């Protein structure tokens, strides 16, 4: 009974071996994909007046709320809803990640690059 309760199945062990031996380089292969997405989206957003830092590597961007006092008063949750209504682009309010995220919006870079660029153009058009 102890073997059944505490050991992993042979199928799971074999799957782990395959993942570790055959797919070890897969995460590195994504580096260039996410770098291109990041750079192209940041280019569009910055050309539209967004102030964004360049993360070294991530699957998302953190976008500060515009410095406009009215927008700052709205907060990230309300402004994210506003942008969704005006642009059709869903951003995650930073406050959902804790108090340190208040005043920020998170944009996931998990869609194809062309779709992300279009989303960035729509965000720029929706901003005051």
Where are the language model's segments positioned?
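PLP-dependent class I/II
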Residues: 1-128
């Amino acid at each position: 009974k102890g073997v059944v309760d505490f050991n992993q199945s042979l199928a799971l062990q074999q799957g782990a071996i395959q993942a570790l031996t055959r797919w070890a380089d897969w995460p590195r292969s994504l580096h260039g994909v996410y770098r291109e997405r990041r750079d192209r989206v940041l280019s569009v957003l910055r050309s539209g007046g967004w102030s964004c830092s360049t993360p070294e590597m991530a699957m998302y961007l953190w976008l500060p709320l515009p410095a406009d006092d009215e927008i700052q008063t709205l907060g990230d949750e309300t402004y994210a809803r506003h942008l969704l209504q005006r642009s059709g682009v869903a951003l995650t309010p930073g406050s959902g990640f804790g108090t340190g995220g208040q005043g920020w919006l998170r944009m996931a870079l998990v869609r194809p690059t062309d779709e992300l660029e279009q989303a960035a153009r729509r965000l720029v058009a929706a901003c005051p």
